[in-house]
């Protein structure tokens, strides 16, 4: 039995509405994959897209970014979609850098904005 691809969905506070809109627009495509998301983002997506089965980890500032980073390092997250807000100062910016660094180190497809995420989801489909 083949394991389904696991996609991580994360969004900064000012990008959460955009992530929810993205998930709604691609709900059918995303339903083919296992989804993991940070706590708040995952809850918002789950409310908007009840057909998706989302595994929620802790909120980003409480360690959720690091939990997903560990999943990338273990090979259990194969795609990262992280809507970053480059205009807001973030107290957990070090965690964000560590997460995107791991995405690069382990050479997984990674989208940091909606335009790239749109292309990535179409390529996976």
Swiss-Prot record:
The active site is at 65 (proton donor/acceptor). InterPro entries: Methylgl_synth, Methylglyoxal_synth_AS, MGS-like_dom, MGS-like_dom_sf. GO terms for cellular component: cytosol. It comes from the Bacteria. Its EC number is 4.2.3.3. It catalyses: dihydroxyacetone phosphate = methylglyoxal + phosphate. It is an enzyme of class 4 (lyase). PROSITE patterns: METHYLGLYOXAL_SYNTH (PS01335), MGS (PS51855). One of its GO terms (molecular function) is methylglyoxal synthase activity. One of its GO terms (biological process) is methylglyoxal biosynthetic process. Disulfide bonds: none annotated. Belongs to the methylglyoxal synthase family. PANTHER family: METHYLGLYOXAL SYNTHASE. Catalyzes the formation of methylglyoxal from dihydroxyacetone phosphate. This is Methylglyoxal synthase. The gene is mgsA.
